[in-house]
Amino acid sequence: LMAEGAARACDSGADIVDINMGCPAKKVCRKAAGSALLSDPTLVIKILRAVVKASESPVTLKMRTGPNQVHKNGVTIAKIAESEGISAIAIHGRTRNCRYDVPAEYETIAAIKDSIGIPVLVNGDIRCGSSAFKALSKTNADGLMIGRAAQGNPWIFSSIRAALDGERWNEPSPIERLEVLHSLLESLYQLYGKEQGSRVARKHIIWFLSYLPIKSEINKATMNKIKTSHDQLNFVQFRKREFENKG
């Protein structure tokens, strides 16, 4: 099935095919998917071999450092990936069992980087320029992958790029953040339809609001009341006018 999906993705114009062996969610791991696959190197070989063979585009892999703290087999999985034709690997600095409950560690990623020749991207606890410097310096990785820290904050990429390049970067104003949120909501409604789109939009509104000088308890309480796409857009516009009036 994964090989078939890869072929379809390539036919649709995908630049890369990315295999996710990093997700620690229970509902995913219960189906022997995501980071649960790290416990079965033989199955990993079969999957990677099939997907690489079926894909006309480069195939990349996203993974964790291993199933648990005792069994960190990240180096083994990374070597398998390289031998099976994977073009690059993004590694999250936690095991499957750690989920997001402990700080990311970069020593295992550094060991993986030293053991293979394909590009390695470091992932985990990268939230700003200083944490990006730390992750890169500790791992000697070829690049960064940012996940949760981008929720509600798409500017994180330009801010980290500026920090790494030693350039000045200007924080977006609350008004600019709300304008981008408004545009995002309209795109969600167009993609999913207004009913489903409004449900998907709720978490994005909360994420964006977390970067504004508004009390979080007000955000959550308010979100329980604004359920329709019309109400959500009006709410964002109302918040925008508040900041405009403050000057």
Which residues fall in each region the model found?
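Conserved beta-strand positions in the central sheet of alpha/beta enzyme cores
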Residues: D18-N20, T60, A90, M145
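Active-site beta-loop-alpha junctions enriched in small/polar residues
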Residues: G22-P24, R64-N68, R94-R96, D125-R127, ...
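Short, flexible active-site-proximal loops enriched in glycine and acidic residues
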Residues: G13-P24
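Glycine-rich tight-turn/loop motif centered on a GG-T
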Residues: K26-L43, R94-Y106, E167-R168
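Conserved beta-alpha-beta core of the PfkB/ribokinase-like small-molecule kinase fold
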Residues: S35-L37, V44-A54, L61-M63, Q69
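Active-site glycine- and acidic-residue-rich loops that bind
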Residues: L1, P58, M63-T76
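Glycine-rich anion/phosphate-binding loops
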Residues: L1-A14, A36-L43
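Alpha/beta catalytic cores of nucleotide-metabolism and tRNA/nucleoside-modifying enzymes
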Residues: K46, A54, V70-A88, Y100, ...
